[in-house]
UniProtKB/Swiss-Prot annotation:
UniProt keyword Lipid biosynthesis, yes or no: no
UniProt-annotated location(s): Nucleus; Chromosome
TM segment ranges: none
Ranges for region Disordered: 1-54
Expression sites by tissue: Gonads.
Function recorded in the entry: Protamines substitute for histones in the chromatin of sperm during the haploid phase of spermatogenesis. They compact sperm DNA into a highly condensed, stable and inactive complex.
UniProt keyword 4Fe-4S, yes or no: no
Phylogenetic classification of the source organism: Eukaryota, Metazoa, Spiralia, Lophotrochozoa, Mollusca
Designated name of the protein: Sperm protamine P3
Molecular function via GO: DNA binding
Length: 54
């Protein structure tokens, strides 16, 4: 159970939320494109963690 709690990454969820808010505030074309790339990288990291849990 302890391993599952660490794997959920409470810190990771908070960081992703802050990044999304910052993208919206900057919001001038270039910032949005960079934000989309960062979002895809985060999605891949989540998938790898889920495979490890299984």
């Amino acid at each position: 159970r302890r391993r599952r709690r660490r794997g959920k990454g409470k810190g990771g969820k908070k960081k992703k939320g802050k990044k999304r808010r910052r993208r919206g505030r900057k919001g001038k074309g270039k910032g949005k494109k960079k934000g989309k790339r960062k979002g895809k990288r985060g999605g891949k990291r989540r998938r790898r963690r889920r495979k490890g849990k299984k």
